[in-house]
Amino acid sequence: MGYKFLKLASASFRNGGVRIVSRQYSTTHDADLVVIGAGPGGYVAAIKAAQLGMKVVSVEKEPSLGGTCLNVGCIPSKALLHNTHLYHMAKHDFKHRGIETGEVKFNFKAMMDYKVNAVKALTGGIAMLFQKNKVKLVRGAGTIVAPNKVEVKGEKGVETVNTKNILIATGSEVTPFPGVTFDEKQIITSTGALSLESVPKKMLVIGAGVIGLELGSVYQRLGADVTAIEFLGSIGGIGIDMEVSKDYRILAKQGMKFKLETKVLGVKKEGSTVKVEDVSIEGAKGGNKETMDCDVVLISIGRRPYTKDLGLDKVGIALDDRGRVPVNNKFQTTVPGIYAIGDVIHGPMLAHKAEDEGIVCVEGIKGMPVHFNYDAIPSVIYTSPEVGWVRKTEEDLKKEGKAYKVRKFPFLANSRAKTNGEPDGFVKVLSDKATDVILGTHIIGPGGGELINEAVLAQEYGAAAEDVARVCHAHPTCAEALREANLAAYCGKPINF
């Protein structure tokens, strides 16, 4: 292969001269790093590794790059959420704002085409970034056959890649429902929900977590009769603050129905109808069973790590009791030179978490400091209103016996939200009673998914509520509600409420 140096010149503003960065390629291996999986974690890690001077091979078995998030997850669902929100506003909200449109209709096929085109543009963008950063893409399913060797089975046969390091970034898959076969037409996963040919008249959603609420909202806005069935007594999934979850039932005012503390016993098709048998948990001790009919049932009970055919057992990597790949704080597995990030390891299954882990992991491989703060990972539910949170809930702090302060500021008292006609929701800040350090932030309201990022920045740098309260915020903005909540947490009272 030879010994190569690629010299890149970049301006150095610190010394006024030119800094030379050399890219040193491996002389004994086909690659310095093979990344298995080109989802959010994998493709970001591959690009960052290449930027740090490594020779990188990305292995991907799917026809398009970007993983679940980009192809059948985060991105297409946000396209549908945004466009159905606009449709809902045009149909129900524009008139009282002085906007007259006549009869408002939607074209479902055109809506789906828009989603497809958005996905294509972004997947194509990843391919261009690979070319720009000289990341080699190998198509096929990757299997680790030795600590320094990956075998890729593709349409053109088998290719073997010798490498110094291997990074597992294979993501996750839908958790199956016992005894149920998905046809992605009537009994569907989130993948099927993103590619239905028409809007069902009646839809049941099993699981009122992030995915269930988002996709349920899409079809409810388009006219479907949507009922979400949840085993727990709250909606929003794991990690949501219970006060936010309670307020979140504002979705019921929009037309979505909920059956909480309900266990689904079975799902079966009878002709063109799907029957779902459920029973309330309380009633299970002596109550009556109930069967509900629907046109489509969406099962969204979570995801599980995807490690199929990776060959982990062959190299001595044992999964934990939840099917995850165990790693240390540098994302190293029990086998030297093999690393793992994203949904296949511990922590929330979030695209942005995987991306950051990918960057930090490859920096560690290059000998750079490794730091990842799992207390500063935001979660967002992209419904209307949006929900965003970071770090501790009030329930967490009570369990820990932590002395804390809790203060809220309603969007009803925020000038921008009220002027925009979006007064529902609030910002809730939890802070240490003794030190004023922020312990958690929870938002339900307009732009909650954007506003939470300021709270994440504050969390990452260990800010106190006073720190945020003393930062000048533009007026009028919804972000002022975050400042006011921190002001209340710091000194006991906000200004505008």
From Swiss-Prot:
One of its GO terms (cellular component) is oxoglutarate dehydrogenase complex. The keyword NAD applies. SUPFAM superfamilies: FAD/NAD(P)-binding domain (SSF51905), FAD/NAD-linked reductases, dimerisation (C-terminal) domain (SSF55424). Disulfide bonds join 69-74. It is found in: Cytoplasm. It catalyses: N(6)-[(R)-dihydrolipoyl]-L-lysyl-[protein] + NAD(+) = N(6)-[(R)-lipoyl]-L-lysyl-[protein] + NADH + H(+). The active site is at 475 (proton acceptor). It holds the Pfam family Pyr_redox_2. PROSITE patterns: PYRIDINE_REDOX_1. Homodimer. PANTHER family: DIHYDROLIPOYL DEHYDROGENASE, MITOCHONDRIAL, DISULFIDE OXIDOREDUCTASE. The active site is a redox-active disulfide bond. Belongs to the class-I pyridine nucleotide-disulfide oxidoreductase family. This is Dihydrolipoyl dehydrogenase.
